[in-house]
Amino acid sequence: MKSLQKGFTLIELMIVVAIIGILAAIAIPQYQNYIARSQVSRVMSETGQMRTAIETCLLDGKEGKDCFIGWTTSNLLAAAGGSTTNNATAADPGQGGLNITYALESTAENKIEATFGQNAAATLHGKKLTWTRSPEATWSCSTDVDEKFKPTGCKK
């Protein structure tokens, strides 16, 4: 009686495991970069929406606590230490937060500064993304995150 062999040999299984290991070694860092880039873009979008509220406050002449920004904090900013008061100071690095600095005059420089907290990717902890309004009423974005994570609209 002839016996039939079924299944894979040890060599075949080892080759499959090696291929999976190589693919994982390439894919995991790429995925981590993708996550960090998407988080920077998300914070840029979330904080960028506050520009309209700040413009409205400036046009209405409202100051500090009289100006309702109407923003729900982002879990990527981990709002510890952040504030939305007139001339707020920077949050504790690594803790994250949101600081909005604006003056009553529309000719002054106004800022929306977001600091990435502990819920963001490890490479983003303590990094900042800032929207700055010039006296000419134009907004620009700047950030200190690594170049490979910067969104197209925030390359400064």
Swiss-Prot record:
Modified residues (N-methylphenylalanine): F8
Effect of mutating K156Q: In strain: Serogroup H1 isolate VCS1215
Keywords, alphabetical: Disulfide bond, Fimbrium, Membrane, Methylation, Transmembrane, Transmembrane helix
A Gene Ontology biological process term: protein secretion by the type II secretion system
Pfam families given in the database record: N_methyl (PF07963), Pilin (PF00114)
Membrane-topology descriptor: Single-pass membrane protein
Cellular component, GO, one term: type II protein secretion system complex
Keyword Mitochondrion: no
Consequence of changing E105G: In strain: Serogroup H1 isolate VCS1215
Keyword Disulfide bond: yes
Propiece residue ranges: 1-7
TM helices/strands, residue ranges: 8-28
Localization per Swiss-Prot or TrEMBL: Fimbrium; Membrane
Assembly with partners or alone: The pili are polar flexible filaments of about 5.4 nanometers diameter and 2.5 micrometers average length; they consist of only a single polypeptide chain arranged in a helical configuration of five subunits per turn in the assembled pilus.
Similarity comment: Belongs to the N-Me-Phe pilin family.
Miscellaneous comment as given in the Swiss-Prot or TrEMBL entry: The sequence shown is that of isolate 265.
Function: Major component of the type IV fimbriae that plays an essential role in twitching motility, natural transformation, and protease secretion.
NCBIfam families the record matches: IV_pilin_GFxxxE
Protein name: Type IV major fimbrial protein FimA
Organism: Dichelobacter nodosus (Bacteroides nodosus)
Lineage: Bacteria, Pseudomonadati, Pseudomonadota, Gammaproteobacteria, Cardiobacteriales
UniProt gene name: fimA
